[in-house]
UniProtKB/Swiss-Prot annotation:
Binds 2 Zn(2+) ions per subunit. GO terms for molecular function: 8-hydroxygeraniol dehydrogenase activity; S-(hydroxymethyl)glutathione dehydrogenase [NAD(P)+] activity; zinc ion binding. Zn(2+) 2 binds at residues 102, 105, 108, 116. Belongs to the zinc-containing alcohol dehydrogenase family. Class-IV subfamily. NAD(+) binds at residues 52-56, 203-208, 227, 232, 274-276, 297-299, 321-323. This is 8-hydroxygeraniol oxidoreductase. It is found in: Nucleus; Cytoplasm, Cytosol. Keywords: Alkaloid metabolism, Cytoplasm, Metal-binding, NAD, Nucleus, Oxidoreductase, Zinc. It comes from Catharanthus roseus. Component of the seco-iridoid and derivatives monoterpenoid indole alkaloids (MIAs, e.g. vincristine, quinine, and strychnine) biosynthesis pathway. Catalyzes two successive and reversible oxidation steps for the formation of 8-oxogeranial from 8-hydroxygeraniol. Active with 8-OH-geraniol, 8-OH-geranial and 8-oxogeraniol in the presence of NAD(+). It holds the Pfam family ADH_zinc_N.
Amino acid sequence: MTKTNSPAPSVITCKAAVVWKSGEPPKVEEIQVDPPKASEVRIKMLCASLCHTDFLACNGLPVPLFPRIPGHEGVGMIESVGENVTNLKEGDIVMPLYLGECGECLNCKSGRTNLCHKYPLGFSGLLLDGTSRMSIGEQKVYHHFSCSTWSEYIVIEAAYAVKVDPRVSLPHASFLCCGFTTGFGATWRDVNVVKGSTVAVLGLGAVGLGAVQGAKSQGASRIIGLDINDKKREKGEAFGMTEFINPKGSNKSISELINEATGGLGLDYVYECTGVPALLNEAIESSKVGLGTAVLIGAGLETSGEIKFIPLLCGRTVKGSIYGGVRPKSDLPTLIEKCINKEIPMDELMTHEVSLSEINKGFEYLKHPDCVKVVIKF
């Protein structure tokens, strides 16, 4: 990579994983990264990780913007800062996030959501001023959300960067940028699981394992994990799962299996972490009549599906969740502290490691039955 010598930040040429067309694999090539504008920071990435949402981005979801650089989990060191940035400096280690928290808008003041109006979850592929900081020659390259961590250098709005405690390992901090935190937060911030309650988690990837750990931390008395891969049993148990069900090969639906396991009562909370639309109905019907809550936190290639009316009419609740309701400034430090105190077995998440040039090998690893998280080392 090269950087022109100048007292002020200048354009950097570096390597990044670029997706040019929906469905095509990322290609590692040279890009140009502009200096940060007044309220932005430029980050030298140290570590990133793969999330299944990145696979969706490679396939044109949620918006088909190409060429684009995916990636929304990672950790890096601030290389330069804009003139108006006062809370961050060169050399700080930070997590680039896809949500911000101004603390002043209606949503932030409510304390009931993490979806900030001033620093929102963005789908335009551009930064807040409506432009990109990345290009290949004259070709503009789109960001993924507000970050694009599959690049050696990135530029983000400073409000989307959270400092990393040096006691947290880089891979662990990367995992907290999305998947695991999404599951954990959904049991704590978005839906506060009551102590002694019963929980099911559909899908035991990083999001599902986060939900299992969160339910355990909240004091759930029974945590049933469901996955079609028997190898996920051991992972689930490491995070606090009390029972495991593999529905593959059964002639019964997931809701039938859960209701059978609960004497027909169902469960207090059911977390749908697979992103398969048909399983939302299974999650709803697995929850208790009149009392149960189904929480939707998975995302997949299918973006719509039918929801049955009668099960909802019977007093059940459905809740959607982004990043588990976790607010970057107010809540994330609590989760980081849990990692520091070894309250969460984060080492269980990391199963594979690749370099940026091996990004497509990382996608192949995601298909392995024993894979949970793939780390990218820069």
